[in-house]
């Protein structure tokens, strides 16, 4: 309920309560007393509504804060895992594919050491912004910790994931070049045509592919369709 609706309801309640009090009295009250009593009841109801509305807003803010990375303003790991569980269950019901991707900034520590933490933070913000811009509103982008990001892509099959990985790499390269940063990225993505047994299995698979891309020499991507075709490597 909105604050405006709550105030209207509280006014109606105050008038109803006041009318009930007046009807219950054997003798009528003087007009100033009537006005004062009505004003007091209205004030009490309005104050209660405003207080409850403020508490509700604060609770919603705290809940959102607990699910958001404070630097990049994308979801944090906790929110990402919760969303992955929801989408995995939906994929089981609908039979639609689900894709998850992990992205790691190669040698991010060097950026922090050479340019400072402020530039490192700015780089992470730029990465998060690029990932949001390359994905749909129904998809989820999260900072999983440090310089590692995750993407949860609903109803996304193999060909669509292939295209997304290409778009991500191009967008990230452009964002880094614009700021003059020398940074590459390792990406691991997996599309589950058949839903995995658990969220942990889904996350672990993407993480393993990401590290496989790093072992291939970094600045690349590994993509796999579970049960479909062998892992692909994009240098």
Describe these PLM feature segments.
Residues 1-33:
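Hydrophobic transmembrane alpha-helices
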Residues 63-82, 103-117, 125:
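Conserved nucleotide-binding and Mg2+-coordinating catalytic segments in signaling enzymes
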Residues 42-66:
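Juxtamembrane or sensor-core-proximal signal-transducing alpha helices
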Residues 123, 150-168, 202:
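Short helix/loop segment flanking the catalytic signature motif in cyclic-nucleotide metabolism enzymes
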Residues 128-129, 160-178, 205-207:
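Alpha-helical scaffold within the catalytic cores of cyclic-nucleotide enzymes
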Residues 140-143:
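A short pre-motif secondary-structure segment
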Residues 63-64, 77-97, 128-136, 154:
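Short regulatory alpha-helical coupling segments
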